[in-house]
Amino acid sequence: MRLHESLSPIVHVLSLSCFFLSVSLAHERALFSGTLNDSETIVSSFRTFRFGFFSPVNSTNRYAGIWYNSIPVQTVIWVANKDTPINDSSGVISISEDGNLVVTDGQRRVLWSTNVSTRASANSTVAELLESGNLVLKDANTDAYLWESFKYPTDSWLPNMLVGTNARTGGGNITITSWTNPSDPSPGSYTAALVLAPYPELFIFNNNDNNATVWRSGPWNGLMFNGLPDVYPGLFLYRFKVNDDTNGSATMSYANDSTLRHLYLDYRGFAIRRDWSEARRNWTLGSQVPATECDIYSRCGQYTTCNPRKNPHCSCIKGFRPRNLIEWNNGNWSGGCIRKLPLQCERQNNKGSADRFLKLQRMKMPDFARRSEASEPECFMTCLQSCSCIAFAHGLGYGCMIWNRSLVDSQVLSASGMDLSIRLAHSEFKTQDRRPILIGTSLAGGIFVVATCVLLARRIVMKKRAKKKGTDAEQIFKRVEALAGGSREKLKELPLFEFQVLATATDNFSLSNKLGQGGFGPVYKGMLLEGQEIAVKRLSQASGQGLEELVTEVVVISKLQHRNLVKLFGCCIAGEERMLVYEFMPKKSLDFYIFDPREAKLLDWNTRFEIINGICRGLLYLHRDSRLRIIHRDLKASNILLDENLIPKISDFGLARIFPGNEDEANTRRVVGTYGYMAPEYAMGGLFSEKSDVFSLGVILLEIISGRRNSHSTLLAHVWSIWNEGEINGMVDPEIFDQLFEKEIRKCVHIALLCVQDAANDRPSVSTVCMMLSSEVADIPEPKQPAFMPRNVGLEAEFSESIALKASINNVTITDVSGR
């Protein structure tokens, strides 16, 4: 009796606890058959996933979707009304009268529906969120699935979700499609899909480029994809099958499910697997494809191999040569290679030895293979006896692979891979032939004779030029001598172009070849007779850049050799004409991309971060690592050119100043540069140093990150205001914002603010900037308020601003703030 009495309070408390727990669990339900308004959700049985309404980052639109419930970072894995957002909180998720799951807005318009043809009623169907993340609509009486979200994925691939085609799906193709951007879940530019014939392969396609292939996994052999040799069964793909009816599906599972992982196709076309870190309370990058340049589909063109561990990555297969040698040497490998010698089987006569095969090891198999079940010896004979066969391979699970068309997308792998045998003419294997030695000797002698003739001809031409140009040529060489230390020998390698040569190259400076208008005159695209593409800057007489600026640029650039500096090919002096000839930059200038919403999407964050690093490396070379110490004085987005691979190159050295080794700063009465990029001590006092270039660098960094121009320093004020609020989302270009890179973006904003501080001494050197960018744990000081240019700084500054108002659109350089 006493025992019963003593336990009664405990039993009572436990009963109440169970009651409230049951109420709580009832509220956190996994299924529903009625309605969910904007503030209501359902959660999976073990609380891994939640379904309801959400808003993406930097957006107020409302979408019905599924996201991870147990982590603080919003990570959406499926969206219902991805094309039809709701702009307020009036949305409702419900079971309609015909038994379908629907999303409606405040006016009861159906924005999305499962659209299942069923005779079920609203009372006989229920929606349930499974612990797998699969949202299902099922018959309440039989539990049969009528519809499931796993058959209609958006950008995420979850464990046990099928990708491909299968009898279960009614023959439909199940693909993964990226979001448009982090703020817009509507279908984006990229799709990942499983392609079955002749071998199952995973592909990423660019929807905006006629479904062009971006990446392929290589063929599947029953255990792994050939192009993903480091991915072993269990870690990435758990099972895969091809059904008898030629429909197939891939399903993925992780070997260790103790760590939360998310595999998705991001809006830039990368398939990314990220892992949740409890220590960091954020996602960390696990792996991604494409991971290297060689992963990009057909990066090197046909008949090539791509090796990410070599520089350059691309090389022609033995027996082949570049299709366009000039383009190839300039790093444009898209044209690929062509065969050096015809195959014996292609010759009209049968004289000569039979073709042979070159074996390449550890290869990712090229695209477009044909499949055969022949044995390895039979595979070899089949290829040898067919002149249309250009390569073959044989491997466990693959059988015999035959190629009858160009070999594209071949890659040298670090591990695993297969042997690929390439058909070549027999003469390609003659290593003991003495003819190469004889040819080499003759060639060397020929080169010597030609070189001698060229030198003699050059001397004669130079003498004729001197007579023809008279005063102009002599004048420029006198200036060159003064700047180059009194020796013309230092500039002998820099050619002087004839005016007619450049006129012909640019089609008489036609408008169709005009690339743009700089502060010193128009720039034209041209092509020399030997096929070299060039950019010609034709200096206008009204530009203010006279002989001094031209000579400065000739001297400065001719002495500099760096990956991130534009290359100068030569110049032209003819009467009143002054022209500079540069290497042609096919991707134009940085401002063309970051300030144009249509082009900005081409530069994702990884690309922009590489551009930032490249600019810093180029500037570090100017300030510290070159033979001369050079202050650029006109560093801005329009003076950062991009080559074919989007590698940045600093250009326009007409305003540069060469510093003696024992000087740190200088003063000038002639303030030159571009408003918005000029440091305050330079704009108002004419004092310039390395730190004035650092200020310009900071402005460029903020423009790259924000996608906005620094007009009248308003960008600096805007960024500083948001920075003080502890957020960066409002200052970052939506095209690049991704929580995956938020830490790195924040660090770059931090560094940029240090670069634009008011006092030059507070700004870091470029070497310090490079160190902070490359360091993960750098102790970066807190920035002070940046320099906001005041309005009333005297007549000269007002004149400077008036020029800048006109120049802000065209990026015209201010050449003199004291009127001419």
UniProtKB/Swiss-Prot annotation:
It is found in: Cell membrane. Residues 290-326 form the EGF-like domain. ATP binds at L515, G516, Q517, G518, G519, F520, G521, P522, V523, K537. GO terms for cellular component: plasma membrane. Gene3D superfamilies: Bulb-type lectin domain (2.90.10.10), Phosphorylase Kinase, domain 1 (3.30.200.20), Transferase(Phosphotransferase) domain 1 (1.10.510.10). Disulfide bonds join C294-C306, C300-C314, C379-C400, C383-C389. It catalyses: L-seryl-[protein] + ATP = O-phospho-L-seryl-[protein] + ADP + H(+); L-threonyl-[protein] + ATP = O-phospho-L-threonyl-[protein] + ADP + H(+). Residues 345-425 form the PAN domain. PANTHER family: OS06G0693000 PROTEIN, RECEPTOR-LIKE SERINE/THREONINE-PROTEIN KINASE SD1-8. Belongs to the protein kinase superfamily. Ser/Thr protein kinase family. This is G-type lectin S-receptor-like serine/threonine-protein kinase At1g11303.
